[in-house]
Amino acid sequence: MLKKILLASLFLNGLVSFSQEIVKEFDLTLEKKRDYFQVINETDKEVILFLNDKEKVSSIRFDEKFNIKDSLSTERPEKKYKEIVGYTQHEGNYFLFWASEDRKEIGVQYFNFIKKETHTAPINLELKKEKIVKELTINNTFYLITIVKNTSILKFYISDHNGNLNEKKVDLSHLKFKNSSNQTASLYSALIELGVDPFRPTVQIEHISNGSQPSLALSSKTFKVYTYKKDELIFTFDSNRVSTDILKINLNDFTADLKSVKQPEIAQHEYYSNMAKSNSFLIDDKILQIKTTPDVLFFTISDQNGNRINQFKTLREEEINYKSSDVFQEISSIHNKKVLDKPKQFIRKINNSNPGVTCYKLNGLYYTVIGSSQDIIRSAPGGMGMGGGFGGAPASFGFTSSYTIGNLISYKDKNVVYTSCLFDSNFNYVADKIETSAFEKARLFLEENEDLKERTSIFGKDLYKDLIVFKFNSLLYLGNYNKQNKKYQIFSFTE
């Protein structure tokens, strides 16, 4: 065991040696109540940062080398607008969409750097018997998506080039959605069935973006939405252990298609089949599925029509013959990390938790992580425990913090067990060393630098309130407001 702990320590020491580059630093004074937002303009190779406090919104436009091109400032919208939930951009016009906490109030803020113009206006939006599904910006267009209660009808409120939101109704009643018992149900019933509070049903769908490598804490969620295609929205549902449902909505004509990709079948009374758990992850045109019991682990790769590409089966006493790293358990911090000695520990622990798989592609290879994530809850002052999140409040991130910040710090207050794997384009195992990703470098940098943390009294945890993370020109960037020195800093991390 000591040897394993030493190996984990050597791994961390190796990570510390990776350097990050500070690409930009400039003077900036912001008040206490502050938040941040970024827009990436790939066409013109620009980054626009919106740096907001309780009184004003300061927008700064950078070129691709982070030289400041120009800036605009205007008043922050009314107090009822709590956060930025998305944006749209077209030919030099930028529109930020602000929303109240309950999303009953929506406002739009306009910026044009060439004309040096800004203005703010309310948007009249009546949500009738609707629940918010997700707020997304795809291909420079903002989508506010709702579902009509007790139906399979989605409503899309879509931004146009003038900052308006136009409604499009998508009726999915002809499609057969499944609940956790693998029975046919409305989409609304399937989505709210697993909610924490039955008296206040909510729709919780995790956004998987290509902005940074997704963590297991996000990919282990039951419902996910993928936005890696510019003209298609893809939802996955893993509420039952029989199959993964894939819902695709074409964003040009809003036609929809639902497919079901089966998980491996486990015979009744075999491998503790009644304790099976499963999940999935999409990448390119493939679906990666994990299914586990206390005695067996299946990892299956198929195309999104269900045609199998490869499958790995591991029994609890067997070595995982397709892994490229040790099996790690990480509790709350990358510094609280140990190596698990026995394969059965891995299979047992992920089955006792929320199993998941995550993957990203680099230089033609698929870098894959298999494991699980579980909330660490605080049962009493000074006490800790494991659970599903009922005893503590998880960090909440609006669009201002973006998917990537929530992703980067998502292992905070988590018990995560994982191993890394490397595959070729056909998902054959590649016996090669896995290099440290930009995501892991940024995560370690975050934990090593106390200046990046804002100490708060909420459950005694650190909230990274002054950070943004974004991908630009194939690099990962971390932006931070240093309130002590009144400076804004941007760091870069390479693969």
Each PLM stretch: what is its role?
Residues E55-I60, R103-Y110, T151-S159, R241-I249, ...:
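Structural motif
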Residues Q204, S215-S333:
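Long, internal scaffold/assembly segments composed of regular secondary structure
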Residues M1-K24:
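Bacterial Sec-dependent N-terminal signal peptides
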Residues Q20-I84:
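Start-of-domain marker
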Residues I68-K104, P122-K129, Q263-N274:
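Blade-loop segments of beta-propeller domains
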Residues E31-I40, E78-T88, L125-T137, K178-N179, ...:
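Repeated scaffold domains used in trafficking and secretory/extracellular systems
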Residues E75-E78, I123-E126, K169-A217, K259-S273, ...:
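Surface-exposed loop and turn segments in beta-propeller and other repeat-based domains
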Residues F37-S59, V85-E101, V108, V133-Y157, ...:
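Short beta-strand elements that form the blades of beta-propeller/WD-repeat-like
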